[in-house]
C-alpha cells in the first residue's frame, strides 16, 4: 500500500475521531477504523435476485401535490416539534459530519432542512438520525434494529422494488453510478476491470449498486461493506481495487483522497427520492408540494451550487406524477 495514502487515511481518521456529535443513531464515521475487516465480505452472487425492471407506474412516478396541509404524520411531527430524518454522516458533499463544527451538512441535509421549514416554519426544527444504507427502509417500516424516522434523505435511489415497501417523493436529484480507482490505474471503465480478472469492487450492503455489481458484472468480485466509509478504508489499505458508487458519493471520496480518481461513463442512472412510509400518501403529497416550491424559487439551485457545483451545471429533475 502507498505510504502516503496510509498517512492520508490516518489523518482523516484522526480528524473523525476528534469529533463528538449530537445526532442520534449509529454514526458511520465511527466505523472508519473501528469496524473489523471481517465486516466486508464477498457478496453472495449465486443467490442475489435481479432488481425488478418492469413496473407501472415508473419508479420515478410519485403522488401529485394537491395542496393538502394535514396528515397523520404531519400531525405527529407538529406535536413533536421536530422532523426526524434518517441521514448519513459520512457521505461528503451529500451528508457528512463537519469535523470542525460537529454538525452534519451537505446537499441531502439542506434539502431535508427545507422540508422541515415547510412543515414547522424553521429549517432548524429537525432531528438527524444517523442510519446505515441497510437501515434506510427498515427505519420507515418499523424494521428491527432501525431507529424510526419520518423521512429518509440518504442518497436513496427510487426503484420499483422499494416502492413495494415504502413511498418516495418526486425525484430531487439524478445521480449516475460510476467507479473509483487508484490514480495509477490504467482502467477506463468496469470492462477493463473485468478483463484484468481478480478485481474486487466494494459497495455497501442493501444498495442498488451492490445488486448491479452482482447481477450485471460477473467479471469482478463484489465486496459488501456496511458503509461507504468502510469501502473507502478498504480501498485505501489496498484490500479492494475499486469502489462503485453514485458520482455524488465518489466526488466526496476524491476530495478526501488525491490518489484516487473516478473513471468511465455512468453505468446507470440513480434517481434520488426522499423515502417515507407507504401508509400516509397525504404526507408524500405535502412533501412533493414543498419540493415544487424549492425548485421554483431557486432554493434547489442554490443548494446544488453550494455542494455539488463542481460536478458541473445542473437543473432540478422534472417531477413525474401519476400514482
Locate each region found by the language model.
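Periplasmic-binding protein-like
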Residues: 173-181, 247, 251-290, 310-323
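Bilobed "Venus flytrap"/periplasmic-binding protein-like clamshell domains
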Residues: 104-119, 156-159, 174-232, 242, ...
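Acidic, polar ligand-binding/catalytic clefts
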Residues: 113, 117, 124-193
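Extracytoplasmic small-molecule ligand-binding "clamshell" domains
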Residues: 32-151
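C-terminal motif of bacterial Sec signal peptides marking the signal peptidase cleavage site
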Residues: 16-21
